[in-house]
Regions:
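Bacterial N-terminal signal peptides that target proteins for export
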Residues: 2-13
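Bacterial N-terminal signal peptides
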Residues: 12-21
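Sec/Tat signal peptide C-region and signal peptidase I cleavage site
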Residues: 22-28
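N-terminal (or domain-start) structured segment
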Residues: 28-113, 151, 159, 173-208
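Hydrophobic alpha-helical segments in the ANL/AMP-binding
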Residues: 48, 166-168
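Periplasmic solute-binding protein
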Residues: 99-106, 120-134, 168-173
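A conserved helix-loop-strand patch within extracytoplasmic ligand-binding domains
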Residues: 115-154
Length: 208
């Protein structure tokens, strides 16, 4: 209960900070109406966003409504928010995708178009393989890639996504970047394909 109270306090501060970040003319009794929170992805991001919106709604006394705006690795949601009024009533459940969408040319603006108001969670992508492969280390995977003379199929969220960039860096360091075929599955689908044996490995967020 103590941790819950601390979290609620942090979220209240975060929402208040959004007021000062997005609007120079907002009133002290903010919010006077519902706040719309853009959610860019499904999976873990959506789960956390739903919990966060419930807590914020309770603390602020106004509905904080999560709205899914998926697509383009986050580009759809970021573009919407960037054009919305800077009055504190439009916020986004952000992620590192703001960097990848900019550098892959999907949006003409970068993270400086927004001001972060709170860090709620952190998550690191995980590389997983089907246990039937018998691989238990990166060395095992490297040996398999070099031995079969073919390509390894690796599931990612999408081309240019953070999972794609992470896996590219890993496989480059392993010396097998030329033996990888990337398959884009969107949010949370790669682990299912991995368990079904249709791909050799997947890089996804642990929550998925």
């Amino acid at each position: 209960m103590k941790n819950s109270s601390k979290l609620k306090g942090l979220l209240t501060v975060a929402a208040t900070a959004a007021l000062f970040t997005f609007s120079g003319t907002a009133k002290a009794d903010y919010p006077e109406k519902s706040v719309e929170m853009t959610v860019l992805f499904g999976g873990t991001a959506n789960t956390i966003a739903q919990i966060l919106s419930d807590l914020l709604s309770e603390e602020l006394g106004q509905p904080v409504v999560p709205v899914a705006r998926k697509g383009g690795g986050g580009a759809v949601g970021y573009t919407y928010l960037q054009s919305a009024a800077a009055d504190g009533y439009s916020i986004v459940w952000n992620s590192n995708s703001i960097n990848t969408t900019y550098h892959t040319g999907r949006i003409p603006f970068d993270h400086t178009a927004f001001t972060p108001i709170a860090r709620i969670s952190t998550e690191i992508p995980a590389l997983a393989v089907n246990s039937s492969t018998g691989w238990s280390s990166l060395a095992d995977m490297t040996a398999a890639a070099n031995a079969n003379g073919g390509k390894l199929k690796v599931g990612i969220s999408g081309k240019g996504s953070f999972t794609h960039l992470t896996s590219a860096a890993i496989f480059d360091a392993m010396g097998i970047s030329d033996k990888i075929i990337y398959i884009s599955y969107g949010s949370g689908k790669a682990p299912i394909e991995l368990l079904a044996g249709r791909i050799d490995a997947a890089i996804q967020w642990p929550g998925q």
